Amino acid sequence: MGQISFKASRCFAFVKESNAIEGIIRNPTKEELDATEALIANRSMTVEALNSLQEIYAPGMPLRNKLGLDVRIGSYLPPPGSPKIEGDLWNIVGMANSRNFDAWEVHVAFELLHPYMDGNGRVGRALWAWKMINDEANPFELPFLQEFYYQTLSQYSDCEVELLREPFKSWETE
């Protein structure tokens, strides 16, 4: 299986755009770039790799694996913090390592779980890029289009999965 290159310039642009989606308007730090490149370089995904990236993006904002570690994202309430969160994250990692799931399915599952207190968006987009690369698609020619990105994530919980499959499929095959 070949792999699409993740050049430093692409990493810089990707992390800068991912930060901008979160309202972080600055150049990526060396630590963010190194951690993102390390995640993308993995041949298989692990919870540890996601945790390492998240710790760079949002230090001190842990996995929500304890009761009371709850978050709210606009009107969306992810599952409450509990030991179950870590098991659910392992399931998402299993999806990521499987050819039976598309990158968008893994990304949406991650975002709906929202496993960390902070940093979920940027880690989720890095997971999406990793999955695209490992499925031999090219995520770096596909801008996130912030408005479409958030609109689609919010519609996911209100729509049939198949209604969303087609737009994402076209992104992955262009």
What residues fall within each predicted segment?
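FIC/Doc superfamily catalytic core
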Residues: 1-174
